[in-house]
Amino acid sequence: MKTRSVCFFLVISMLLISCNLWTITGNKMITPSNVVISENRDVSGFNAINFSTLGKINLMQGDQESLNISGPDNVVPEIITEVNNGNLVIRTKENIDINPLGNDNPLTFTIVVKDLTSFKISGAGDVQMEALTTPELTIEMSGAGKIVQNQVSTENLDLSISGLGGIDVSGQATQARIDISGAGSVNAPDLQTQTANVTISGLGSATLWVTDQLTGNISGAGSVSYYGDPQTKTSSTGAGSFKSLGSK
């Protein structure tokens, strides 16, 4: 019995060791090194971004598009960056997974855009967007992460969250649409909007500033808090609630 227990322990140990190299899906697992490199990628002609790996993103508006990636020297080469039909795609190579607990040197993406109308992120990302002026902007977030958008100026703003993500946004938008499924949150008390439509299913929450008209629907235990004195047309089922925070 003792011999059998020792053999079992050895087998389990070998399996655990192998899990550091390969995931249960058969993908190769890379543990980031402690050597940091920086690499400029040749990108141009895009107004949309699709990000599906992990890391920190610093995004700003400027006259010249650019992309810089810094991070572990064994991870940066595994990141694909390509522009397809105006969409900048940033992803990990196929059959590759990155150990998110590898070290204290995360991937960092510094992106300069001339214009941005769509930003989609899936996976785990920490995004910092600086002041942005654009006719319309759609932000779609799935998975876990945080997006901070400072001082956006746009006619139409569309925010969508599925999962545990959070979006903080300030600035001005003529119209805003917010769609949250899961436990995501939108924090926008400093985003002045004329009209807003909010749809929440699950435990999501949103804080807004609306001047003219607010419409919305909550199914589940979600909540919407708003500044301003807009006309309202809202409905909720379950424990959902709409709450006025008074004038701004």
Spans of model-derived segments:
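Intrinsically disordered, low-complexity terminal regions
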Residues: 1-248
